Amino acid sequence: VGMDQKDAYVGDEAQSKRGVLTLKYPIEHGIVTNWDDMEKIWHHTFYNELRVAPEEHPVLLTEAPLNPKANKERMTQIMFETFNVPAMYVNIQAVLSLYASGRTTGCVLDSGDGVSHTVPIYEGYALPHAINRLDLAGRDLTDNLMKVLTERGYSFTTTAEREIVRDIKEKLTYVALDFDQEMKTAAESSQLEKSYELPDGNVIVIGNERFRCPEVRFQPSFIGMESSGIHDCTFKTIMKCDVDIRKDLYGNIVLSGGTTMFPGIGERMTKELTALAPSTMKIKVVAPPERKYSVWIGGSILASLSTFQQMWISKAEYDESGPSIVHRKCF
């Protein structure tokens, strides 16, 4: 082992050396499962990417809906004790996405790499009893596409090759408005086919895989999951809410996260929800162009509000009360 090798690589650097590394993800289904690795990522973020001293800046962290209490405390503890931040706050990702879209009431479908949630939010507060969690997100779609391509005779097996498939997914797939009709079209002509050049120069052609891959979100049975599709999860979430606010939720369905970036997803959601909801209900699905980063954008909006400044948990408050203060100040 040469002197120039580190014991761990994070982020883009790990991606660029992925051929000789084993890639690990400290977050599973939106919940942190490996705190040592998570700390490495935070350290890398502060010192190598942002190049800031964490002890000089308040930190706003985001969390998955229904994040376990112990996790919230651990997050708080690491920020204050390891990174010595002067102040911090924790907020739910979906709520921040809604702020980014300029709303305080609506139903957010937030879907990232490991987990999807449908979260109803009224006047800035998430309604926990009605949140639906679906353990079907970006990574599952990538895995499914790997499998489908393997059936076609292309072999993708290593963690490095998974990243190639993820790139294919991000560049070429889309959601069909009518899946069966699209399958017919794909069978009858080659107009839906697209080619992709692999890093070694080989070219692969993908056809109906382009829309079969994200269709799993609407029909999880495709990969043997018994859960409801994202349209059904959204409908169930709204139905668990008070009848008086349903109209506001139906009229403000906001998509957020990288796994809502598929072209056609907004139109398909509108179509599916129109079929489920009362016929007189006005349904509006909003897919903001910046939705891949809307959680971050919402966080930057929140943290810059003058009214938010008294919400921070300060180092002094933490020293006095310990990690459990996070439940009293962030809800």
Curated annotation (Swiss-Prot):
SMART domains: ACTIN (SM00268). It catalyses: ATP + H2O = ADP + phosphate + H(+). It is an enzyme of class 3 (hydrolase). It comes from the Eukaryota. Its EC number is 3.6.4.-. Its main location: cytoplasm. Keywords: ATP-binding, Cytoplasm, Cytoskeleton, Hydrolase, Nucleotide-binding. PROSITE patterns: ACTINS_1, ACTINS_2, ACTINS_ACT_LIKE. It is found in: Cytoplasm, Cytoskeleton. One of its GO terms (molecular function) is hydrolase activity. One of its GO terms (cellular component) is cytoplasm. Belongs to the actin family. Actins are highly conserved proteins that are involved in various types of cell motility and are ubiquitously expressed in all eukaryotic cells. PANTHER family: ACTIN (PTHR11937). This is Actin. It comes from Costaria costata (Five-ribbed kelp).
